[in-house]
């Protein structure tokens, strides 16, 4: 997946699949804006990329801030001169109850609204140049619904709908828009989620048993490695997927097959 000369922006890129994606993009020749609320973590990823001879920029801030969600696009263009690819990877689990309206607002703000704002700013740049690729991280929960987190399912279903609508709207502008729908990913967030007191089967003494239970619905019997999600993401962002737009691709070991 040759990304030589491309300029990419990745959110939630200080750890997990986002970090893996930033590293792969850089390895394939792209300059990468690494965005994360954990600014120190973003800088660590940038340092790693630069040590490998790549170009990268760390942008730390809270994507619930509309101004920051827009400004990361301008900062990327200012640093590298253009923007070719955006991976909206940010996502957080929502509450397991449906009457937690504060939790609902937070889930929608981070899982959907912030991605829309960043995407709008990116589209202005991409449509002017008549080329670009945008990717959203949705979830299998957005495809089939999760009884453990209805607010997360609703927000991620919104992400899928947004990706499909924008794909149709901007195909004529040379911009492709897709979504990936991971299942369980082996990251610290998975452990935090399954071990929350409000989750069914909560058992603080043995979180690994909860992880095991979380992936039993997966025919492959395990969670994805972050790199397995990131490789698919980079493919969809790349010119190798030049005729692919408007899809919501499960990357889930067969969970929704």
List the predicted regions and their residue ranges:
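C-terminal substrate-recognition "lid" of short-chain dehydrogenase/reductases
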Residues: 2, 80, 116, 123, ...
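Short, small/polar-rich loop/turn modules that mediate ligand/substrate recognition or access, typified
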Residues: 171, 176, 244-246
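Conserved NAD(P)H cofactor-binding loop of Rossmann-fold oxidoreductase domains
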Residues: 89-94
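Active-site helix of classical SDR
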Residues: 119, 155, 163
């Amino acid at each position: 997946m040759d990304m030589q000369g491309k300029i990419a922006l990745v959110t939630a890129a200080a750890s997990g699949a986002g970090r893996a994606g930033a590293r792969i993009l850089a390895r394939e020749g792209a300059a990468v804006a690494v965005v994360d609320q954990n600014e120190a973590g973003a800088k660590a990823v940038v340092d790693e990329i630069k040590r490998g001879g790549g170009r990268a920029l760390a942008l730390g801030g809270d994507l619930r801030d509309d101004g920051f969600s827009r400004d990361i696009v301008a900062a990327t263009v200012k640093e590298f001169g253009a923007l070719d690819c955006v991976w909206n990877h940010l996502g957080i689990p929502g509450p397991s109850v449906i009457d937690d309206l504060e939790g609902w607002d937070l889930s929608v703000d981070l899982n959907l609204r912030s991605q829309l704002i960043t995407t709008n700013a990116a589209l202005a740049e991409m449509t002017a140049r008549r080329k670009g690729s945008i990717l959203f991280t949705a979830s299998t929960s957005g495809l089939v619904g999760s009884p453990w987190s209805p607010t997360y399912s609703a927000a991620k279903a919104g992400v899928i709908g947004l990706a499909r609508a924008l794909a149709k709207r901007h195909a004529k502008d040379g911009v492709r828009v897709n979504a990936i729908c991971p299942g369980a990913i082996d990251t610290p967030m998975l452990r935090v989620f399954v071990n929350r007191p409000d989750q069914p089967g909560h058992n603080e003494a043995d979180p690994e048993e909860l992880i095991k239970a979380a992936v039993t619905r997966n025919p492959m019997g395990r969670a994805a490695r972050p790199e397995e999600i990131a490789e698919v993401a980079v493919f969809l962002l790349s010119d190798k997927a030049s005729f692919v737009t408007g899809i919501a691709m499960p990357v889930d070991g067969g969970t929704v097959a």
